[in-house]
Amino acid sequence: MKNILFFLIVCISLTSCKDSHANSVEVPVTYTNDTTNMVYLTYSGTSVSAVVCENIKNYVTITSTGSHVRVIQSPNVGLSTGEIGYELTGTSENGSFYMEGAYKSTVGLRALTLTNPNGPAIDIQNGKRVEISIKRDTENTLTDGTSTAVDAWKGCLQCKGHVEFKGYGTLNVYGNYANAIWSKEYMTVRNCTINVLKAVKDGINCNQYFTMESGVVNISGQGDDGISVGLKNNDTSAENTGSFTMTGGTININPSGASGTAVNALGNQSVASSATLNTSWTQSASNVSDGGKSVKVLREGQVLIIRNGRTYTPNGNLINN
């Protein structure tokens, strides 16, 4: 009898430790006849409410523990349904957004202030294309915590797939545990303003490649690299793997006592004349620079500076016309 009782106690203990969403409840949902495939989530302190388009109600399951929202997207979402969009707004000092799916999606941020003391503020477990739409003229702030009460995480905003940041708003990110922004695959930035204000590790950490087309990225308060670009699945032969490219926009990186480099890419780096990369890093023997643009290149990569349609090496040698 004692052995049976001990076994039951252990089982209950293990179950409660493993399932952090055991006490989650369904989020109050208002359905709308709109057919735009949207889910609207409004955070308000320790609670959250949802508005869901009627045509996709059978394709999303929304639960929460307080303001910690968990969205599970049906595996049946695909070409016939179209992608589902999520728009987050409101404020919570103890909340988060978790989304799990297997088809491309868009997550919009509209005047959102979200802090998770025990994990990432936004956690997207979707290996497809995920667009982060920062809504026009809005300021959004994400902050994670320092507690390891849950499984370790890699970024205040983290994504399993490839992330495309777009929009004409502002996103502020405080990474108090690891990186501020982390993506398992590639990352692109267009039009928006991203301010990384703190990162225990890298300001931005992604794999495959990083491309800046337009907009502004400001990085400060990081403990290691400003931007780190790794390989895709450690495949050194994959196209564009580990590359850093700027075709436009502005990136400002302040070392803030960091031990890393401004840009640490495992592949080639290219900065066009229409783009600006500013850093106050002190150049070291392992770095190359162009006008103070300090970068680190590994895996026999190279830095290309493009001016007026011509490509140069950092020391000014013309490669092609």
Placement of each model-derived feature along the sequence:
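C-terminal outer-membrane/trafficking sorting elements
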Residues: 285-321
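A composition-driven surface/loop motif
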Residues: 18-287
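Generic alpha-helical secondary structure signal
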Residues: 10-11, 35, 47, 316
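Short, low-complexity S/T/E/D/G/P-rich linear segments that nucleate or cap local secondary structure
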Residues: 6-8
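Positively charged n-region of N-terminal signal peptides that target proteins for export
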Residues: 1-4, 18-19
